[in-house]
């Protein structure tokens, strides 16, 4: 990677499960109950502190609990120390929503405020260890709502990652309409936005608070492609999305996708790669070029 001038991104989800004492490399259920000394670190939901549907990766923490914050920050710093080749370390929370802590302490603030406070603590510890690892923070589910009070104390440490997992792929981002407001946050009763204007509203809310490096982590080939049998429509959406990154105030694009998205063809990734390299690339020309190479005389069929 280094010889080729590439930057290494690592981790993502899984930290919360590790804090709770589980080796967390998947979303699988774990039948082992929480250890008594870990129970206070788990999110309290409906009066109970336990694994969310049995999955450590999907279980949130109680960030009012100092031990949870301390353990989380220590894990991140130890990982950074042990993996100096990592350029961008992704620090995400649980991979589920409507399952954040309901304890009295957590109710006094918001998940995003607690998240930013955690990120600041991680930054202080990385700085103390003289580690330059960049931290990628996540706009996703509850964390789409911007913080109310907290702000990142050392913005140069951080990279914003916008992850609109619930967006529609029927169309690309649209800037023609008027801006819409961010809906009120209701703890454990949020509805994820499918509307593109609403997704952009969340991004703009964070961009008012953070002006550093940023990119989108998007999902066109996660499952939306299943409804597009020839992959032509989704390839056009990908092209349009990439061409609008700068208008969205974003600096790059990561595709959260299945690896085997080549049936009946690999057109979407072909268009994605070329358009990221050259935003002026004509999607129709790329489609024609790909189909001619793949299907020869039958390209027009």
Model-inferred region functions:
Residues 296:
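Extended ligand-binding regions for polar small-molecule ligands
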Residues 1-242, 250-280, 284, 293, ...:
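Aromatic-lined carbohydrate-binding surfaces of glycoside hydrolases
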């Amino acid at each position: 990677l280094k010889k080729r001038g590439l930057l290494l991104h690592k981790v993502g989800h899984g930290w919360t499960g590790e804090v709770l004492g589980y080796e967390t490399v998947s979303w699988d259920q774990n039948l082992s109950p929480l250890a008594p000394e870990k129970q206070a670190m788990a999110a309290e939901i409906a009066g109970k502190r336990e694994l969310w549907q049995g999955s450590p990766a999907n279980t949130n923490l109680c960030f009012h609990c100092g031990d949870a914050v301390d353990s989380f920050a220590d894990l991140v710093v130890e990982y950074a120390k042990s993996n100096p080749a990592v350029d961008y370390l992704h620090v995400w929370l649980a991979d589920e929503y409507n399952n954040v802590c309901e304890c009295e302490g957590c109710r006094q603030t918001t998940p995003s405020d607690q998240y930013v406070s955690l990120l600041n603590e991680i930054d202080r510890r990385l700085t103390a260890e003289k580690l330059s690892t960049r931290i990628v923070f996540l706009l996703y589910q509850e964390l789409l709502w911007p913080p109310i009070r907290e702000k990142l104390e050392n913005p140069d440490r951080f990279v914003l990652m916008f992850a609109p997992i619930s967006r529609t792929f029927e169309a690309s981002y649209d800037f023609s309409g008027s801006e819409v407001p961010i809906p009120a946050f209701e703890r454990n009763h949020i509805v994820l936005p499918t509307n593109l204007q609403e997704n952009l509203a969340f991004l703009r809310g964070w961009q008012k608070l953070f002006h550093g490096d940023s990119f989108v982590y998007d999902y066109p080939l996660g499952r939306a492609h299943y409804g597009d049998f020839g992959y032509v429509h989704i390839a056009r959406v990908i092209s349009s999305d990439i061409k609008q990154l700068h208008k969205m105030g974003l600096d790059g694009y990561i595709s959260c996708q299945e690896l085997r998205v080549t049936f009946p063809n690999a057109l979407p990734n072909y268009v994605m790669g070329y358009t990221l390299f050259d935003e002026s690339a004509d999607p129709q020309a790329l489609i024609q070029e790909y189909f001619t190479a793949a299907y020869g005389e039958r390209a027009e069929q």
